[in-house]
Structures are given as structure tokens and as C-alpha cells.
Amino acid sequence: MKEPIFTGAGVAIITPMNQDGSVNYDEFAKFIDFQIENGTDAIVVCGTTGESSTLRVVEHNEAIKWCVKYVNGRVPVVAGTGSNSTACAIEISKEACEAGADAILLVTPYYNKTSQRGLIAHYTAIHDATDKPIILYNVPSRTGLNIAPETAYELSKLPRVNGIKEASGNLEQVAKIRELCGDNLNIWSGNDDQIYDIMELGGKGVISVLSNICPQETHDIVQTYLDGNKEESKKLMDKYMKLAKAMFVDVNPIPVKEAVNLIGFNAGPCRLPLIEMDDKNKAYVKETMKEYGLIK
């Protein structure tokens, strides 16, 4: 059995930006404090929502190092360190481990279109070059590559492969991973609209976009389930379903950055090639947030 890095809701945290595109660390600090004070169980930095794909390597390493230092052990920090280049992923992962991240989150290599055997070789190389727990990240809608359940099983044999962030949307696949791996591979939902469903399949929680604006509520969806109150967990899931889906009316993290700006933080713009939402989607996000009482 592998103890999970965290249970509950880890926020896939945005990276606040200044208007010139540089990282706004003053606002980042305020936003991390808000997250921790409102129930977030882990900070997942430099993931998809943190715009890792548009950070230069030096910025990526700096953001992780700064985040670990600022969080200062208050909650676990999981650092997104994946790349489609194994060598690059190893380089960033080593930096994150040396900085003191509690775990590293490794997205599947994108664009290269490797095989399942190639995936095993990729993750094994990173595992052997680092010394911290690893969370696999399966998001085929973005990468074009799915981690098959049998591949997840093979990777679960590596001692520091702690779990998988499952964002395939395929619950049958999640069930198969659970069947093959049991407690040797922890599962976190990578989709906010599937938190309850994945908890039902043995999940430990969620790595969440929604937590950026509703940290306590997202934590509560998971925690009520873990406490044995499945009915309340399901009610909360149903209640926040519309809001969770509103965060994906455009490409993540465009809507959630808009939402974070609306609740009073200076999230700033996304970096190119991501651009702001059109007026229709902006209005929808704003009206949905009003429905939930997040803004007036």
C-alpha cells in the first residue's frame, strides 16, 4: 500500500501574471494564502492550469522553488515537471526535488506519439533520476496519448510512483486501473465534474481547477465522502456541477483566470497563444458566478 501524497482537494493553481507577462509573485503569495486559509489540501504548481507550457524552463524552475519556499510546509506542494522531452522532464524534476517539492506531477509526453512501451521507458527514466514521489498525469484530450490501465499497472511497480491524476474522462478506464493496481496506485480525479464518481471507484480526491475559486467547497465534496457521508458529498457535487463546467467554456485556464480576477485577485492575463474569452463566454462565467454568490 502506498500512502497518498494528500487526500482531499489539491488546487491546480493558476500562475498570476503581470500585464507584461512576467509572474506576479506578490499576487501569487496572496492567492496561496487564500487557498490554504480556505481548505485547500495541496498546492499543485506549474500544471496545465498554471500555464506550464508557456513558461520558459528558468521561469518554471523559479516558480516551483518560490512556491515551495512560500508555502513552507503548510500543505504539500506537488510540482508539475512533465515534458514531451524525457531529458527536459528529468532536468525540471531534479530542480523541483532539490527545491523541496513533496511530489512531482508528470504529464504524458505530448506531440511525440510514443507507444505504451515508450511511456514506461519515459517514466522509468524520470523515476530513476529523481528521489521524490511521482504522480502520473493522464490527460489524452490535451496530449493525444492515453496511459492504458495495463501501463499504469506496470508503472505502479516502481516504488516512488505514488498515484495518477486521471483526466481521461473514461470511468471504465479508472475502474480498470483500480482493479489492476489496488492500493499500489492512488487515484485523483483530474476532472471536477467527476470527483464523486472517481471517489466511488476508490479515489483519494481531486486535483482541481474549481478549487481556485471554491477551495473550501471542493474540499468538502471530497472530505464528506471520506468521512462516510456519501449522500452529502453527492449533493455538493450536484450543486457545484454547473460552476465546475463553466470553468471549461473555453480552454483551461482562460475561464478560471477570468473567474479569479472576478473574485478580487489580480490573476492577470494568460500568456500567448492563449487569449481572453469572447464577450459571450465572459458573460456566462460572470452570471454563473453570480448564481453561486461568488460575486454580486
Show where each model-derived region lies.
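Active-site beta->alpha loop and helix N-cap motifs at the rims of alpha/beta catalytic domains
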Residues: 2-11, 15-144
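Short, amphipathic alpha-helical "lid/cap" segments that border enzyme active or binding sites
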Residues: 25, 29-32, 149, 282-289
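A general structural signal for well-ordered alpha-helical segments in protein cores
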Residues: 28, 60, 64, 89, ...
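Short secondary-structure boundary segments
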Residues: 47, 108-109, 167-168, 191-192, ...
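Surface-exposed amphipathic alpha-helices with a cationic face
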Residues: 64-72, 94-97, 127-128, 156, ...
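Short beta->alpha linker loops
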Residues: 81-84, 168-172, 190-193, 213, ...
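Ligand/cofactor pocket segment of small-molecule handling proteins
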Residues: 101-103, 110-204
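Structured C-terminal cap/extension of enzyme domains
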Residues: 193-296
